[in-house]
Regions:
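N-terminal Sec-pathway targeting helices
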Residues: 1-18
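Hydrophobic alpha-helical membrane-insertion segments, chiefly the h-region
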Residues: 20-30
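Active-site-adjacent loops and short helices of periplasmic peptidoglycan-processing enzymes
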Residues: 2, 31-209, 219-221
Length: 371
């Protein structure tokens, strides 16, 4: 019997481990609602979440859910670091110029806003929409950042990327490192301007959930958040160049039409459709929203309607009732082993309207000795 156990010890351990995971997932499937829960990306060592973040789909609540055009949607509470609403929010999607949100914060954190940037032929040759930078000429980093974030100029994004990263490839590496650092494991960027691209690894993409976390970091958590907000809240920006005076206008309509939007970035490519990511502050709450594939020509205004619907939903009673129970599995590095598994069961805590705050069970299985 002892010989048999030793011979098959590793297989037995594997079977036990699989059974434990199966039980965790099985418990999850019994929950009646799936909705607002901690984003796994915020735990950098997360392996996977046992459930997709979606609003509970039952007859009573369907009536109150926002009616949206976007293919992929996320609504995020930046203070609780939880999701209020999700629709296909973990799907890998082309995200167009919303990429420039991360381009901007990486540039602000890695370079001086008063740097002088010399324009390459590569940057000058970027397609519309563009400022019309002249190869060989020099521009101020600050002016390029405003051009990129207010007017979404593609040549400005490339000029910034080459200056900060040494090349667009080098800058893409910095972007992906930052995304990973803040927990956005569903994001992979290739271009600094968000134009569709692919390489041997993957295609240029993010998720609605990740983009909310990226915007939350940029607006409130980065050491350069103040500069980021100053740029993205500016309605009009004027500066002088060798080519004459330049005037940039902000295309974020929610800044003009609401009193709660504090930052945002639009985007469009044929593949991505119309996209929009925003940071808002309403009724004492700090939130981010993300809309991907929100219509194609001639439906340019869908994103504004969807954004407003999401914000109204966020402060409604319907959103307060959409919390859920959830189970998750995460890795934890303990000592010299990376084979420690944490299983956490999280109970709905409706009494104080907070979710994923109380761990009823938090037990650890160290499988490092079995494999």
């Amino acid at each position: 019997m002892v010989i048999f156990f030793r011979k098959y010890k590793s297989k037995i351990a594997l079977m036990v481990f699989i059974c434990v995971l199966f039980c965790a997932v099985s418990c999850l499937l019994d929950f009646k609602t799936l909705g607002k829960q901690k984003m796994p990306g915020l735990e950098k060592k997360s392996v996977f979440m046992a459930a997709e973040n979606t609003v509970a789909k039952n007859t009573d609540k369907d009536v109150n859910e926002p009616r949206l055009h976007a293919v992929s949607v996320a609504l995020y509470d930046a203070d609780d670091e939880t999701f209020i609403y999700g629709k296909n929010m973990r799907d890998s999607m082309a995200n167009a110029s919303t990429t420039k949100i991360l381009t901007c914060i990486v540039a602000l954190e890695k370079a001086d806003i008063n740097d002088t940037v010399t324009i390459s032929q590569n940057a000058a040759s970027q397609p519309e929409v563009k400022l019309g930078l002249v190869a060989g000429n020099s521009y101020n980093m600050k002016d390029l950042l405003y051009g990129m974030m207010l007017e979404s100029f593609n040549d400005c994004a490339y000029a910034i990327a080459e200056h900060v990263g040494g090349s667009t490839e080098g800058f893409a590496k910095l972007m992906n490192e930052k995304a990973n650092e803040i927990g956005c494991l569903g994001t992979y960027f290739i271009t600094p301007n968000g134009l569709d691209a692919e390489n041997d690894i993957s295609f240029h993409h993010s998720t609605a959930g990740d983009l909310c976390v990226i915007m939350s970091y940029c607006a409130w958590k980065s050491p350069k958040s103040t500069q980021f907000l100053e740029i993205t809240q500016t309605m009009q920006y004027t500066f002088e160049t060798k080519e004459g005076q330049m005037v940039f206008s902000n295309h974020n309509r929610l800044l003009k039409e609401t009193d709660y939007c504090i930052s945002g970035k639009t985007g469009f490519t044929t593949k991505a459709g119309y996209c929009y990511v925003a940071a808002v502050e309403k009724d004492g709450r700090r939130m981010c929203l993300s809309l991907l594939g929100c219509g194609w020509p001639n439906n340019k205004n869908y994103k504004w309607a969807d954004a407003k619907s999401l914000v109204e939903y966020a402060v409604s009673d319907a959103a307060e009732d959409s919390y859920c129970d959830a189970a998750c599995v995460t890795t934890q590095q303990t000592g010299d082993t990376r084979n420690t598994i944490n299983l956490k069961y999280i109970e709905n805590n409706k009494k104080n309207k907070k979710i994923c705050k109380n761990f009823l069970k938090n037990f650890t299985i160290n499988i490092g000795n079995f494999f």
